Design a protein with these regions (language model features):
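Accessory, non-ATPase domains that flank or precede helicase/AAA+ motor cores in DNA-metabolism machines
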Residues: 1-311
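P-loop (Walker A) phosphate-binding loop of NTP-binding proteins
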Residues: 339, 350, 386
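Hydrophobic anchor at the beta1->P-loop junction of P-loop NTPases
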Residues: 347, 383
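Conserved helicase motor core of P-loop NTPases
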Residues: 355, 374, 463-606, 617
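Post-Walker A helix-loop "phosphate-sensing" segment adjacent to the P-loop in P-loop NTPases
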Residues: 365-380
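C-terminal accessory regions
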Residues: 612-729
Length: 729
């Protein structure tokens, strides 16, 4: 039997936009002996709530739990408002401020006329209020409307819970649709999936079928089509799918046979409702099609803005060269000039070609030619990158502030929306985005919407690296469209032409490996190793790494030579068990003080982002369990609620490493990795190494990866749209 407590809500301790609440509750009654000590005292409670009114009476159902830090708390599973029954309580309730225009004297008059069942009487027969002298029609409407709204909302939330939605999901649904919730539920329950990011198709589908919906209901097929297109495009990076593909995925998702007529009818309805767009047998989610179209149109607009002319341009660039004590090659000079004269510029190049040097020069040129102070420069220019580590790296290189695109757009993790958007644009005049190959279509569309139409853009990246995790391949499409201002940096910058690491990167990209590369060199060491001895060889090299700066980059987590196994082994080399180091086991994995870990998701409130690497400084493993991680001077506290947001980082995935650089990199290469061996992946891994690179494993695996350049070719239409929108510029 669930425990229940009846009492008064006293105050909020914490309240999130998602409806999660921590608060104080004064207990008056309980059905649980363990809670008797709290009668006439307050207890801390947690749970998801629609709305709570201070000093109102509620009935909470749930359980008494022991929090590792804060002691006994009541975890609320469901709740209901208790309408006051006593005369004084009813007067207090009606005059609480919840009912606008109803003061204490008016409340006393109402209760005096209607008696102890005042609230029930108002709900069931509001016309009785007309019998009370001095009560206005406006007050009657307020009383009836407010009581009805509150009663309806609670009944709706409870009914959603009875169907199988969690309290959190029920609140998300009600907060989205309010009084229309029941209508939407009856008309098309699948709109809950379509409209609310946190609610999954599978959850809604399970509840719909359980509630008696026919397996071939057109509303179900429509939702499955939207789910299929979204999931597959996110997985493979496509902008669109073909009809036959969608049909196959939908049948797999629904686990039912549907006729081609039923499928076609659903497609037609989705087109009519503008939820999908069909162009020449290509089927897009409307949001994706509009994102590509917006990007192409904005690029076209920027290309049409007249060039900026300045007689001081050449002399100012010469001044910039003097400032940095360097001379730029012709490609670099071209990029620097175009960054000023043009309103959109793409700069691409491989490792060692001076992309970061160009960004520094562009910023300095903009400052000097516009006669800006450092403070004014930072107000007018925004240096952005897709990841926290990449933004930190560009900030260190330029001595200017930089941040992630999400941070710049003021991403709200509660509703997954940006505060900087088409309705509230940023005031910056110039935006430079580094590591642009990692930016997906939706994110770039959001960035453009958050900028003024005349904001200058410089986009910098290496399009031979891995594309974005999300859909699209924007940098590649922009370059291959031949429609934009593009500068390709080819000449190796300064002394880096002597780097064997960079030579290997270019050989990989050209699919022409020189056998001499397998001879051991100072900065590049290939160690042929049988598959069963790769991890042992990694440990051997790690024991010689006295500086503890080596970073292992691997393609996948599982298998004998996967990231998880390598991390387990390397922990004992770099951070062995010690009586002086406290430990904590999380999901079967031991974490100890001084462990190197990687952040797996964004925590913008803590200024820590996906891919950031830190060191565990403190662990508390007593009645309270906490882990403190230092990210380059920013110490973040983790509790059990977010322990899943980090992993060991002695070995990390190549995808997670993108946007970062390491002095020493070790890449295990075994045929065991299968489909994860492909050119762009290995090229990206190799280009993470600054000073030293180890390749450990099978030569045949390296050769297989280099020859495999056809993995997951992405289907997009941005290239064609750019050509169409810019053809007459």
């Amino acid at each position: 039997m669930a425990a229940c407590i009846k009492g008064i809500f006293k105050r909020y301790i914490f309240k999130s936009d998602s409806g999660y609440v921590i608060g104080l509750f004064k207990v008056k009654e309980t059905n649980n002996n363990d809670l008797d000590d709290f009668i006439d005292h307050t207890i801390t409670f947690t749970g998801y709530f629609h709305e709570l009114t201070l000093d109102d009476t509620y009935l909470f159902n749930g359980s008494l739990v022991e929090h590792e830090k804060y002691g006994r708390q009541f975890q609320v599973d469901s709740y209901e408002r208790v309408l006051p029954e006593e005369k004084d309580a009813t007067i207090e309730f009606l005059s609480s401020g919840l009912f606008k225009g109803i003061g204490e004297k008016t409340a006393e008059k109402i209760v005096s006329y209607l008696g102890k069942d005042t609230l029930t009487t108002i709900l069931e027969n509001p016309s009785n209020l007309l019998l009370i002298p001095g009560i206005t029609n406006k007050q009657i409407n307020i009383l009836n409307k407010t009581l009805t709204e509150y009663e309806a909302s609670y009944r709706t939330i409870v009914s959603l819970g009875e169907l199988g939605f969690s309290t959190r999901d029920s609140l998300l649904i009600y907060n989205k649709y309010k009084e229309k919730t029941t209508t939407i539920l009856n008309d098309n329950i699948y709109l809950f999936y379509e409209d609310i990011l946190e609610i999954t198709f599978k959850k809604v589908d399970t509840i719909a079928i359980k509630s008696g919906l026919l397996p071939n209901d057109i509303r179900r097929i429509e939702a499955a089509i939207l789910y299929a297109i979204n999931e597959v495009c996110n997985l493979l990076g496509h902008s669109y799918l073909f009809k036959e593909e969608i049909m196959n995925y939908v049948v797999r998702i629904l686990g039912e046979r549907i006729t081609i007529e039923e499928f076609n009818s659903a497609l037609v309805e989705l087109e009519k409702d503008s939820k999908i767009i069909r162009i020449n047998e290509k089927y897009y989610l409307t949001a994706m099609y509009e994102a590509e179209r917006n990007i192409s149109r904005r690029c076209g607009y920027l290309m049409r803005i007249p060039d900026i002319i300045s007689k001081k341009l050449d002399s100012t660039i010469a001044s910039v060269e003097k400032h940095f004590d360097c001379f730029y090659n012709q490609d670099q000079l071209n990029a620097i000039k175009l960054s000023y004269t043009k309103n959109i510029l793409v700069v691409t190049g491989g490792p060692g070609t001076g992309k970061t040097t160009i960004i520094k020069a562009i910023c300095e040129l903009y400052k000097e030619i516009n006669k800006l102070s450092y403070e004014k420069l930072t107000e007018q220019i925004a240096l952005l990158a897709p990841t926290g580590r990449a933004s930190k790296r560009i900030s260190e290189s330029t001595n200017l502030p930089a941040c992630t695109i999400h941070r710049f757009l003021k991403w709200n993790k509660e509703n997954n929306k940006f505060a900087i958007n088409e309705y509230h644009k940023s005031d910056v005049s110039f935006v430079i985005v580094d590591e642009f190959s990692m930016v997906d279509t939706y994110l770039f569309d959001s960035l453009l919407k958050g900028l003024r139409y005349d904001t200058k853009l410089v986009l910098v990246g290496d399009y031979n690296q891995l594309p974005s995790v999300g859909p699209g391949e924007i940098l590649k499409d922009m370059i291959e469209s031949n429609s934009l201002n593009v500068v390709s940096l080819k000449e190796l910058y300064r002394q880096k032409e002597n780097s064997n690491i960079i030579s290997l990167a270019y050989q990989i990209n050209d699919n022409q490996i020189d056998e001499a590369i397998f001879n051991q060199k100072e900065d590049l060491i290939f160690i042929p190793t049988p598959v069963n001895h790769v991890t042992d060889k990694i440990l051997e090299i790690a024991r010689e790494d006295t500086s503890h700066t080596m970073q292992v980059l691997a393609p996948m987590y599982k298998t004998l030579n996967g990231i998880d196994m390598i991390n387990h082994s390397l922990q004992e080399v770099y951070n062995p068990k010690s009586k002086n180091k406290k430990e904590l086991v999380i999901n079967g994995v031991i974490f100890r003080e001084n462990d190197k870990v990687i952040q797996l998701s964004n925590m913008p409130d803590e200024n820590v982002f996906n891919g950031d690497i830190g060191i565990i400084t403190e662990i508390y493993n007593g009645s309270k369990k906490e882990i403190y991680i230092d990210f380059d001077g920013n110490t973040v506290r983790y509790t059990p609620a977010n322990f899943q947001k980090f992993k060991h980082a002695y070995a990390i995935s190549i995808h997670k490493s993108q946007g970062s650089e390491f002095d020493t990199v070790l890449i295990p290469l075994v045929n065991q990795y299968g489909k994860m061996l492909y050119r762009k992946l290995i090229y990206t891994a190799v280009t993470r190494a600054k000073k030293k690179l180890y390749l450990v494993g099978e030569i045949s695996a390296l050769e297989k990866a280099i020859q495999n350049n056809d993995v997951n070719l992405r289907r997009t239409t941005l290239k064609e749209m750019l050509i169409e929108n810019i053809k007459n510029v």
